[in-house]
A protein has these predicted regions:
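Short intrinsically disordered terminal tails
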Residues: 1-2, 47-49
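A short, charged, amphipathic alpha-helix used as a generic interaction element across diverse proteins
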Residues: 26-48
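N-terminal acidic leader/helix
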Residues: 1-25
Length: 49
């Protein structure tokens, strides 16, 4: 089973695929939920690193 992790900083609208201080860690167990969340962040103008 794979786990999908994402760090999100809502103040700067940046999502990271690696640990970033002052960001909230989100954990997804299902790939489809992870991808849907990434799509929603993209629609909200988030940048990814």
């Amino acid at each position: 089973m794979n786990d999908y992790l994402l760090w999100v900083d809502t103040s700067t609208k940046i999502a990271s695929f690696h640990e970033v201080e002052a960001s909230d860690l989100l954990h997804f167990e299902q790939y489809e939920n992870f991808m849907n969340y990434l799509a929603s962040l993209t629609a909200q103008g988030y940048r990814f690193q």
